[in-house]
């Protein structure tokens, strides 16, 4: 007797638009949506806080030694998993209907995003490592000069070496490799969330936390930019271009003025707006497009 033919079984994620449009009921749908969005908001708050703590404290607190070196080298180890978690919380990584579907050149969308993120993470870690190593070398040379001032007269080239580590590796090469990696990571996150729609935020508390995440993202861009050579000019152009693109994109899909319907994209747009305001205030305060060292602040 011929065996009964069974149609292939498909597993649907109840958050996906496809499962909702098919009318698949879920008694836990509302709670799951709420918890899912809460997780994203928490990540959007915690991630910039961690990066700010690791990047800003050494600027205002002058501490040397092994503890300071470990502190600086720890930043990518902590921040990169948080950055990755933001991306993998998107429905691209959680909707089972997306699994195995060819996206481009034989890669699934998840595979493409993982490769994309890893390229950014590699640059981010390399830049952070180069920056931290240059600081160690700079402090070591300064300590030698302080202990033996006569060495500069005997070996004037030591000033050139110090300049190379401070301005060549720390302030320019390390900073910009680090920043390019962060930009690539952020673009991977935005690409992962480009089609994703959320239920929106229905409480004042949730709205304030969500806005706080965007403000922190903007503070990160604004405060870090003033550390870079020509950083204020670079970030001014960057946030204007990317912010304009996000504005047009969200406006096109009628999500620009909603409360969290495009949770991540709107949060980043808030951040770029805050960063733009910070940089404009900075330029006005220092009377020009200067970084922190050029302005003579906290040097």
Residue ranges and their predicted role:
Residues 37-46, 105-115, 202-210, 258-271:
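Membrane-interfacial loop-to-transmembrane alpha-helix junctions, especially the N-terminal start
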Residues 160-187:
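Hydrophobic alpha-helical transmembrane segments
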